[in-house]
Design a protein with these regions (language model features):
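C-terminal lobe and adjacent flexible extensions of AdoMet/dcAdoMet transferase-like proteins
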Residues: 174-178
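Mobile active-site "lid"/loop adjacent to the S-adenosyl-L-methionine
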Residues: 87-116
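A short alpha-helix capping/helix-coil boundary motif
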Residues: 27, 97-100, 123-128
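Short amphipathic alpha-helical segments
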Residues: 48-49, 95-98, 144-150
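Short, Asp-centered acidic motifs that coordinate Mg2+ and/or phosphate
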Residues: 82
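Conserved SAM/SAH cofactor-binding pocket of Class I
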Residues: 2-76, 85, 91-93
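Conserved Class I SAM-dependent methyltransferase catalytic core
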Residues: 113-173
Length: 178
């Protein structure tokens, strides 16, 4: 229920090759700009191939090859009205590592931490901004990540809500209200 989707500042975080953000641009055709943040350079070429197929010159797609820890910096503070994200699911030491370093970086918080990820979302959300991301609860690993999110955010103006559950994965909504 954003009044002017054309001015909506959107981020696809942990973007991979950008498919989720690109798909969003088809469902919300009034969107004019999307930033994509990904740490793995292997996705860069695929991202540019994907946007070449979009054929919508009114869209501005910006690719940032960086760690989400960068979102803690002033430059990114209060920057996005909408964030969508499919982050890693597993904590180091929980779950089976793959022989592939590439797959492990997709699946595990190896380049930073879960706490840093949540703080990065909170810092980069604008007032009244919303972030949607996937979260594996990991209760079978003895973890309660949703409770961890609430603890991380308790001294902030950001709230967390479980809005749906799909095949063992929760969809989490963070909202910032200053």
């Amino acid at each position: 229920s954003y009044p002017d989707l054309g001015s909506l500042r959107v981020l696809d975080l942990c973007a991979g090759c950008g498919v989720i953000g690109i798909e969003l641009s088809w469902y919300l055709q009034a969107i004019r700009q999307i930033d994509f943040i990904e740490i793995q350079d292997i996705y860069t070429e695929y991202f540019y191939q994907n946007i070449a197929n979009v054929n919508r010159p009114e869209l501005q797609f910006r690719w940032h090859l960086l760690n989400y820890d960068e979102l803690h910096k002033k430059k990114w503070e209060d920057k996005f009205d909408l964030i969508i994200s499919n982050p890693p699911y597993f904590q180091p030491g929980h779950g089976m590592l793959s022989p592939s370093k590439f797959k492990n970086r997709c699946r595990f918080y190896l380049d930073s931490s879960f706490q840093s990820y949540i703080q990065a979302l909170g810092n980069s959300l604008a007032n009244r901004g919303k972030a949607y991301f996937l979260l594996r609860p990991l209760k079978h690993h003895g973890l309660d990540l949703f409770s961890d999110i609430q603890k991380i955010l308790q001294e902030t103006s950001v709230t967390a809500t479980k809005i749906s559950h799909i095949r063992g994965t929760d969809i989490i909504l963070l909202e910032k209200l200053k």
